Curated annotation (Swiss-Prot):
Homodimer. It comes from the Bacteria. Pfam families: CTP_transf_like, PfkB. This is Bifunctional protein HldE. It is an enzyme of class 2 (transferase). GO terms for biological process: ADP-L-glycero-beta-D-manno-heptose biosynthetic process. The lineage of its organism: Bacteria, Pseudomonadati, Pseudomonadota, Alphaproteobacteria, Hyphomicrobiales. It comes from Bradyrhizobium sp. (strain ORS 278). Keywords: ATP-binding, Carbohydrate metabolism, Kinase, Multifunctional enzyme, Nucleotide-binding, Nucleotidyltransferase, Transferase. Pathway: Nucleotide-sugar biosynthesis; ADP-L-glycero-beta-D-manno-heptose biosynthesis; ADP-L-glycero-beta-D-manno-heptose from D-glycero-beta-D-manno-heptose 7-phosphate: step 1/4; Nucleotide-sugar biosynthesis; ADP-L-glycero-beta-D-manno-heptose biosynthesis; ADP-L-glycero-beta-D-manno-heptose from D-glycero-beta-D-manno-heptose 7-phosphate: step 3/4. Its EC number is 2.7.1.167, 2.7.7.70.
């Protein structure tokens, strides 16, 4: 049985050595509404731009996003783009990078001009020298890579045919990895699969597979038949053919092919989706996953990646939301573990134009009065964040005999309510820190308060928000329920 949480935790303990062609990906977003008077060419009115680590560097980003450790070796020029990539890689937690500088070539850089409204790529400009590295650079790459194999659980080679993975580099790395008793995953570019001989798994896309096998294989059976000669030629354990909306088919040397369908998803941008697939596959296999489980996780990751703009990485939390049934994960996913996750979730809602509300309390024993406040609060906004007093905070406020239920139990009860979208536990006596972080459009409080008495009202009103006071429901209180229960026991 596929246990996502166990596999995800195992992935976080792995180290993946990633070697390949590093690129600087730039995206220029705008709209086209006219043709240039100077030439029959569209004019893009630029609205924004962004820069990402691309190519094999995006593979490393995805490895780190899963919680695993990535060691990355790549090649850049002696230029500003190379400096920028080195700086960007240094910012990513979980990636240790070793970059070899080649003054004879520019750092590979790709600039894409994209229609913001339609997410359509209109033009791409490339700066590159797609030639094999010189013997001197090859030796520097090999010298950098080989000592790192001992520190890795698996080796991943991402070939974009930009010069890093020459025949000599491939041979040295694959042979050394096999001698160490470890797997090598290769995302190939060359149609000559023999140069990857000895790799454990090759992951060509449909076009690359057709060129390598000189076939027009479409069905699972045709792919399996065409792959057999390729497996023999490359002396590999298996070939995984990725097929975009058709899913992916794994053909092992021994055993039956395995086909995993693609998740239905609205595609925004396919840039870097293959990087995501191979990163997840390598990390899952390093963690000891069965083929089916690794493929299921990789397919889900691809679906998440193509639903994002630009060169995207995919986190373990995003995978969890994609893979696990909604009823299983809905409640527990509402419970926020840290401020960073809370800020990210709220930022996503705001980017979607949603109105965020906030309320707080101990919620020790949930009663109709609580439900009234929470329901009214949710009616006043699009997404409701509930600040929940921690156990230590409740003790300070209510006494040593409280809470009756620990903070996790109270959080799970709140998270199960349809009115609640997120639960954030705070240890302080007041939720001011959370309010400053969330900056809600509406701050809701139940009880006999004036607006000025509500903690955080200054923060909310200064940002243009409002404070909403809800009348309490008479005859319902946790303290009364606790006292009644204790008197009944006497």
């Amino acid at each position: 049985m596929f246990d996502f949480d166990d596999l995800s935790q195992a992935i976080a303990r792995q180290t993946v050595l990633c070697v390949g062609d590093l690129m600087l990906d730039e995206f220029v977003y705008g709209e086209v509404s006219r043709i240039s008077p100077e030439a029959p060419a569209p004019v893009i009115a630029v609205q924004r731009s962004e820069t990402n680590i691309g190519g094999a560097g995006n593979v490393a980003r995805n490895i780190a996003a899963l919680g695993a450790r990535g060691i990355f070796v790549g090649l850049v020029g002696q230029d500003a783009a190379g400096d920028q990539l080195e700086a960007e890689l240094a910012k990513v937690d979980g990636i240790e990078s070793v970059l070899v500088r080649d003054p004879s070539r520019p750092t590979t850089r790709k600039v894409r001009f994209v229609s913001e409204h339609f997410s359509t790529h209109m033009l791409r400009a490339d700066w590159e020298r797609a030639a094999p590295a010189s013997e001197d650079i090859e030796q520097k790459l090999i010298a950098a890579i080989l000592p790192l194999i001992a520190r890795a659980d698996i080796v991943l080679l991402s070939d974009y045919a930009k010069g890093v993975l020459t025949a000599r580099v491939l041979r040295n790395v694959i042979d050394a990895t096999r001698r160490a008793g470890k797997r090598v995953i290769v995302d190939p570019k060359s149609a000559n699969l023999a140069i990857y001989r000895g790799a454990s798994v090759l992951t060509p896309n449909r076009k690359e597979f057709s060129e390598a096998t000189r076939s027009r294989a479409e069905t699972e059976q045709e792919i399996a038949a065409a792959a057999q000669d390729a497996i023999y030629l490359a002396d590999c354990e298996a070939i995984l053919v990725t097929q975009s909306e058709r899913g992916m088919t794994l053909v092992p040397r021994q055993g039956d092919p395995i086909h995993v369908p693609a998740y239905p998803v609205k595609v925004r941008d396919v840039s870097g989706a293959g990087d995501t697939v191979v990163a997840v596959l390598a990390a899952a296999l390093a963690a000891g996953a069965a083929w089916e489980d690794a493929l299921r996780m990789a397919s889900a990751a691809a679906a998440v990646a193509v639903s994002k703009q630009g060169t995207a990485s995919v986190t373990s939390a995003e995978l969890r939301r994609k893979i696990l049934p909604h009823a299983y994960r809905a409640a527990e996913e509402k419970i926020i573990e840290n401020d960073g996750e809370l800020a990210t979730r709220v930022a996503v809602w705001r980017s979607e134009g949603l109105r965020v509300g906030f309320t707080n309390g101990c919620f020790d024993i949930l009663h109709p009065g609580h439900v009234k406040v929470l329901t009214a609060a949710r009616a006043a906004c699009d997404r409701l964040v509930v600040g929940l007093n921690s156990d230590t905070s409740v003790k300070r406020l209510k006494g040593e005999s409280r809470p009756v239920q620990d903070e996790r139990a109270r959080a799970e009860v709140l998270a199960a309510l349809e009115a609640v979208d997120l639960v954030a536990i705070f240890t302080e006596e007041t939720p001011l820190r959370l309010i400053e972080l969330v900056r809600p459009s509406v701050l809701v409080k139940g009880g006999d308060y004036t607006r000025e008495q509500v903690v955080g009202h200054e923060v909310v009103e200064a940002a243009g928000g409002e404070v909403l006071l809800i009348d309490i429901l008479k005859g319902h209180s946790t303290t009364a329920l606790v006292d009644r229960a204790r008197s009944d026991q006497r």
